Amino acid sequence: MVFLLDNTYFAIYRKLWHTDRKGIDMQTKNKTSVIANEKIDNKKLANAEKIILNLQQELKKYIKKGHGPFLAAIYDSKGNLVAKTANSVVNKTCSHNHAEMNAIKLAEKKLGTYDLSKYNLSIYVTAEPCMMCLGGIMWSGIKSVYYGVPSERVTKITGFDEGFKPNWFNEFKKRGITVYGQIEQSAGETVLKDYVANKHTIYKPTR
């Protein structure tokens, strides 16, 4: 299990999300906790904090244009931006158009390949990837994942269905994919709360 620490309580991630604490590192910073499937590298973390905070701020503009409340960016190992896209499920009427999937498609088109592994790319997302996007990331060849708001909080704030993702941190580690999560979480939660407060569409199928 992964213990999440903030200034008021300890919370335990559901077993559905993380079933094994082994191999998970945690660093408490600014009263929230960053978790990773490797020993936390402060240089990587500092870079990710800067990128994700900028994405959280930029996301507000995308929402005003009709996009969903998630933004993803893909960078190469030299820090060059390869692709950046927002969620476009509603405005493009396609359930697959999550921010991560859009960014991956754009990167593959730009680089002319379905296999991104040789480019050593990292994806930065304002929130934890859903079940579909985890599959897309894994099969694209992306090497590292950095995200903001964890799925448990996304669901609680918005009502979005993030799918089932048992022990995905360790599954990604087995495949050589680095994961850092809960980066600039507070800023990301504020954007999601504003999205809900302004009565934007919570897109999911009727059950």
What are these regions, as identified by a protein language model?
Residues 9, 23-63, 129, 136-207:
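Zinc-dependent deaminase
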Residues 77-82:
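Short, glycine-anchored, charge-dense loop/turn motifs used at functional sites
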Residues 117-127:
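Immediate flanking context of iron-sulfur cluster ligation sites
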Residues 70-75:
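Short beta-strand scaffold segments in enzyme catalytic cores
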Residues 83-89:
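Short beta->alpha transition motifs characteristic of CBS
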Residues 90-102:
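A short, polar/charged loop-to-alpha-helix boundary motif
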